[in-house]
Amino acid sequence: MLWVSRSVLRLGLGFTTHRAPQIISRWPRWGPRVACHPCSSSGQNPSGFEPPEKVHRIPAQYKPSKFDKKILLWTGRFKSIEDIPPLVPPEMIAVSRNKARVKACYIMIGLTIVACFAVIVSAKRAVERHESLTSWNLAKKAKWREEAALAAQSKSK
């Protein structure tokens, strides 16, 4: 456990936050706020930082790559490459990537099921021809024995 002494946190807006002394086991910066007041008596920030009067919230834009454009088309977000704007929100890219990931998983599930049926059909055909792993192994070992016997005869001559 750590003792956190009375700490001061300076915010960028010209205010100071005091935190009460307390015992904190993991996160020493967390704690109840005790008081907030301006940093200087004049009310201006001594560091010279002035906050902007008006803050505009513009969503972040992202320029999609060729691969991202293909994903946007494949997931049905846009009908053609020409319809895709030059800048798109990152959330749109993330959503389309997740949809593409799910579609790819469904395709892999389908291919796995098709492969299982293909293995079943080929196994039934092998049974009709009386082929099995045991018969293949016995034939291979018999061939090895014949080769070993021929090699022993050629050595003795």
Swiss-Prot record:
The keyword Transmembrane applies. This is Protein FAM162B. InterPro entries: DUF1075. Belongs to the UPF0389 family. Disulfide bonds: none annotated. Pfam families: DUF1075. The chain crosses the membrane at residues 104-123. It comes from Mus musculus (Mouse). The keyword Transmembrane helix applies. The gene is Fam162b. Keywords: Membrane, Transmembrane, Transmembrane helix. It is a single-pass membrane protein. Its main location: membrane. It is found in: Membrane.
